[in-house]
Amino acid sequence: MATKSTFKNFLGDLPLTAEIDWKLRTSRRPRKDHFNLDKLQKALPAARAVVEPIAKHAKPGKNVLFFATLHYWIEQSAFLGLALAGLGHKVTLLTLPYAEWHKEKDKFTQRQRVLHTRDALATLSPLVEHTSMLDLKPGAVLTERNLADIKEISLWDVQYTLMREEVDMNDPADRALYDLRIERNTFAAKAAFEYLQSKKPDVVLIPNGLILEMGIVFRVARYLNIDAVTYEFNDQREQIWLAQNSSIMKQDTDYIVEARCKLPVTDEMFERVADLENARRGARVWGKSKRLWQYVSSQGAQETRHMLGLDDRPVVMLAANVLGDSLTLGRDIFAASMTEWITKTVQYFAKRNDVQMVIRVHPGEKLVPQAKSMGTVVREALPELPSHIHVIGALDKINTYDLIEIADVGLAYTTTVGLETAMNGRPVISCGQTHYRGRGITLDPNSWDEYYATLEKVLSDIPAHQLNEKQTEFAWNYAYRFFFEYPRPFPWRLMNFWDDLEAWPLEKVLSAEGLAQFKDTFDFLVNEPFTWK
């Protein structure tokens, strides 16, 4: 295998070898490569035919640079680019045709991926211009800030890939992955730096905007003071998360708090939040999602207490996130990592047998078995678990919402369980940079000293730290805005994109019916100010 890869690297260094082979042989064969845009290539001619007459009558819009990498993002971005072109925007799609972000591929195969992407997207022209980042030959000199961004994002890339926070630079595999991410992110930064300066777009549109080259392009755009919009998807069909001039993975909700949380919560809003919470409590899917947030339905507070062997001492619940989830990266405040926070927290509570501690490992760990479990972190911190500390694994038949009900105090890093515990009127100590922190409904230490002092103060008089009626009402208000107004209507998620496209073809999306639902979102994607109906 190594000999074959070496030979392909040799061929890849020879001028025109990949191009000649592609033209005479490979382009006519069925693709066996994981990077496969054949389905997209077949679908685009009909899609362009739909958009072309609409675009001719559209009012000229913005100059949009759209960055996408990995074949699944490229598939979706091609159709989103066409939709924006149909609304009058001048769209350039800048692609980075990698199949994997964590593996090196021989130069010959990589050059042919560039050719495959070029052919697949050729039909977009002239509605959408396409450029491959790998065709650029950047020579930009990066600043210290750019280099610092590259190092930070490359470390996050490794944590995201390995699904653990500890990266051992003395371990050959960890180091090789980190070096690969440094190399690729450095190239992307230089290419983006020169390309953005030459294109001078009004706005850069980027998926995710936190990790991999997506994070790099976002950072470079902001460094150059170019507006950037980032987006991701939740579990609901026909919804999108959007952020303007911040990474969507940071979940900055300041703007929605300012604009919406001063408005009262109606009975209908309250009931809608309660319906969502009851679905999770009952281990039911909700709305247009197929995801179960809990795998066992509520068994009630008393039964849960009995199952865990809890007595009358106060209960402190620590709700964990999944390690390596990009929603947790870069969220540290006083702890170096969530692992360190959990380690020191359980060691503190090991000496506090005046209370009982329940650690809820995130049920989502079931979906990523390769991730280091928070249960493992606890066992490493406390090889002999005291009887007053209980670890509930991802697959254990305990419902998180029963734990919220029996908890007297909540501890959270970034999980939404912290918000939901506050909605129950319980004091919550927020220890990571999460969207509901600093809203007046959590206790927010900024150092280890403050954290331990807050624990001592709360545990000495738990009733005095219960949320008052006004705080609890705000928690429900905020929950409504976050769950129902923060997501925006959008036709095509990344997952199940082709199924969504069947339900919402371009002609339907750009019809009066489609625009009534999605036009505002398309406007927000090109950095028009957020509004609410």
Residue ranges of predicted features:
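Histidine-anchored nucleotide/phosphate-binding helix
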Residues: 71-93, 97, 218, 337-350
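A short, glycine/small-residue-rich beta-strand->loop->alpha-helix junction that serves as a flexible
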Residues: 67-77, 206, 327-328
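A donor-sugar binding/catalytic signature common to diverse glycosyltransferases
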Residues: 202, 213, 239, 396-443
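Conserved catalytic-core segment of nucleotide-activated headgroup transferases in glycan assembly
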Residues: 282-380
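Conserved N-terminal ligand/cofactor-binding loop architecture of enzyme catalytic domains
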Residues: 2-63, 83-186, 233-295, 496-500, ...
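Donor nucleotide-activated moiety binding/catalytic core segment of transferases
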Residues: 54-57, 182-198, 309, 332-333, ...
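Long, C-terminal catalytic modules of enzymes
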Residues: 4-34, 38-41, 305, 312, ...
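Conserved nucleotide-sugar donor-interacting segment of glycosyltransferase catalytic cores
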Residues: 188-243
